[in-house]
Amino acid sequence: MVDHLKRQDEKVFAAIEAELGRQRSKIELIASENFVSEAVMEAQGSVLTNKYAEGYPGKRYYGGCEHVDVVEDIARDRVKEIFGAEHVNVQPHSGAQANMAVYFTILEQGDTVLGMNLSHGGHLTHGSPVNFSGVQYNFVEYGVDAESHRINYDDVLAKAKEHKPKLIVAGASAYPRVIDFKRFREIADEVGAYLMVDMAHIAGLVAAGLHPNPVPHAHFVTTTTHKTLRGPRGGMILCEEQFAKQIDKSIFPGIQGGPLMHVIAAKAVAFGEALQDDFKTYAQNIINNANRLAEGLQKEGLTLVSGGTDNHLILIDVRNLEITGKVAEHVLDEVGITVNKNTIPFETASPFVTSGVRIGTAAVTSRGFGLEDMDEIASLIAYTLKNHENEAALEEARKRVEALTSKFPMYTDL
């Protein structure tokens, strides 16, 4: 397959080869990224990319869908088995579109929604004014406690009582602690609101039984299929059976046309992997590595939002190093460590600058990194940030990164 691409389009082939080289040679710590299996990539690069299949299994608007119907049913059934969901839609192209479909199912323009503040750990689609969610709906924000940096559930309840939202959104893109979904449902019930949980970052941990499952508590659960779930980039929706027809209509014909059947096939393969015993071991290793990395960073004198982590994600406050998140991201990338700048609770800097960096352990754990490697990564991060203007020190860091990544070859068949 690669040989065909190389002969047909040398420029695209070269860019893909360069990206493969980047992934092999750098330490990937972006919390929303992971490395899929070769089987997932094979499914996504299959002949299913040729097939249009508007509609759902058994009710398509095109002929010739008998085989893609099988694939979509496999994907849906596996998700039900993993999470205990009553109904599943695996067609969303992204987590953002999954969230949009839920909003379109139960909200009217201007309805009030309670969601987590973006700088406190929420997501753009949870009411940011630059996103469709903040434009179409009246979002009221809740956040974290100023000292503990954990969700203040009493504050959530108080705001829910005051504003009477039609929907409460739980879930986050930069919150390193366990979320109490049962408490959120109690709050939603008290004010007569629906509850939607966006579990995009923690879905793999939930699948492995290592994080509380939101499905028994939420009317709707949305997620991406990559991140800790280690599937292709995409989204899905899990919901109570009473909302099944509405959700399906919101996706098609509501906001999407034909589903990406090659991606759904890749999702199905990833869900099959998540059902294996070794996936639970993998997820436990993600958490163990995150805890070890957090401990190492703190020993090096770095400040962590909330003081640590319960999941795969760590948020570093770099202000005591007298640098910005933007500078930290750049200098770490220069030595071969990939992270992303990120706002922190009660942020004062621009989102293009930020006071923090977000890191995660899903990708390095997929690659085989263990606890001792987390010690070295913590040392490397601290050494690099503390010496960000010292070229000799940065060159030493580059060599240490190269020595570490060389121990863990990846995608050797490509």
UniProtKB/Swiss-Prot annotation:
Pfam families: SHMT (PF00464)
GO molecular function: glycine hydroxymethyltransferase activity; pyridoxal phosphate binding
N6-(pyridoxal phosphate)lysine sites (modified residues): 227
InterPro entries according to UniProt: PyrdxlP-dep_Trfase (IPR015424), PyrdxlP-dep_Trfase_major (IPR015421), PyrdxlP-dep_Trfase_small (IPR015422), Ser_HO-MeTrfase (IPR001085), Ser_HO-MeTrfase-like (IPR049943), Ser_HO-MeTrfase_PLP_BS (IPR019798), SHMT-like_dom (IPR039429)
UniProt xrefs under Gene3D superfamilies: Aspartate Aminotransferase, domain 1 (3.90.1150.10), Type I PLP-dependent aspartate aminotransferase-like (Major domain) (3.40.640.10)
Keyword Kinase: no
Complex and partners: Homodimer.
UniProt protein name: Serine hydroxymethyltransferase
